[in-house]
Curated annotation (Swiss-Prot):
Family: Belongs to the triosephosphate isomerase family.
Catalytic activity, as annotated: D-glyceraldehyde 3-phosphate = dihydroxyacetone phosphate
GO MF entry, a single one: triose-phosphate isomerase activity
One Gene Ontology cellular component: cytosol
InterPro entries: Aldolase_TIM, TIM_sf, TrioseP_Isoase_bac/euk, Triosephosphate_isomerase, Triosephosphate_isomerase_AS
Pathway(s) annotated for this protein in UniProt: Carbohydrate biosynthesis; gluconeogenesis; Carbohydrate degradation; glycolysis; D-glyceraldehyde 3-phosphate from glycerone phosphate: step 1/1
Protein name: Triosephosphate isomerase
TM spans (from-to): none
Originating species: Levilactobacillus brevis (strain ATCC 367 / BCRC 12310 / CIP 105137 / JCM 1170 / LMG 11437 / NCIMB 947 / NCTC 947)
Length: 252
């Protein structure tokens, strides 16, 4: 059984004080983790504060990125080893904004995936799709290649634990979500790619999320799809009330 995962990605938003206020506001308002798992990826500056404030909570505190080396002369980077020692369970890898603004290549993303696994955490691997590639009919080739490249050299034992997010960049921050059918199509394609690389059994156990303008008013339709196991929400995860609604989508 795949436990739904409702995850937020704050990107470069909020202050330490606001992060603590968010944790306080959602306490007792989220489902139990064995029913619906919830997580928020936050800037590295806030992680320890959030972990401390959330000591008794069900919310998972996640990282937005990390480097592929555990330590060394890499000014400004975040060590995956340090994240693990802090108690961070998830790290986002391969978000379209990291690919676009920081020139992260498939090779870099693959090395980051392996670093996250090496340090006992779980990657939330993001797969991008541009509108140009969708209209040009290159969607399948593009998404398959991203998944395959990110998992190069990753064992089946590790791959079975990964979370993959289908995030069409034409929907991110646009206010226009993919339709539930489009989300299902993308998530199904990712699952089939995992089956081709590893096995049907492994693919059927991996959680695949949808991300891109997810809101309380469209999450129920997305979560009704058989291959959509959760969401990776951006803007709607910044507001406490909105995030609580996302997490409790079954009541909407």
């Amino acid at each position: 059984m795949r436990i739904p995962l409702i995850a937020g990605n704050w990107k470069m938003n909020k202050s330490v004080t606001e992060a603590r206020q968010f944790i306080d506001a959602v306490q007792g308002q989220l489902p139990q983790a064995d029913v619906i798992e919830t997580a928020v990826a936050a800037p590295a500056l806030f992680l320890q504060t959030m972990l401390d404030a959330n000591a008794e909570g069900t919310l998972r505190v996640a990282a937005e990125t990390c480097y592929y080396e555990d330590e060394g002369a890499y000014t400004g980077e975040t060590s995956p080893r340090a994240l693990h020692e802090m108690g961070i369970p998830y790290t986002i890898v391969g978000h379209s904004e990291r690919r676009r603004y920081f020139n992260e290549t498939d090779d870099v993303i693959n090395r980051k995936v392996q670093a996250v696994f090496r340090n006992g955490m779980t990657p939330i691997l993001c797969c991008d799709e541009t509108m140009g590639r969708r209209t040009a009919g290159e969607k399948i080739h593009w998404v398959v290649n991203q998944v395959s490249a990110a998992l190069k050299g990753v064992s089946a034992e590790d791959a079975a634990k990964i979370v993959v997010a289908y995030e069409p960049s034409w929907a991110i921050g646009s206010g226009t979500s993919a339709s539930s059918d489009q989300a299902e199509e993308g998530c199904y394609l990712i699952r089939q790619t995992l089956a081709d690389i590893y096995s049907d059994d492994l693919a059927n156990g991996v959680r695949v999320l949808y991300g891109g303008s997810v809101k309380p008013d469209n999450i129920a339709g997305l979560m009704a799809k058989s291959n959509v196991d959760g969401v990776l929400a951006g803007g709607s995860s910044l507001d406490e009330t909105s995030f609580i609604q996302l997490a409790n989508y079954q009541n909407l």
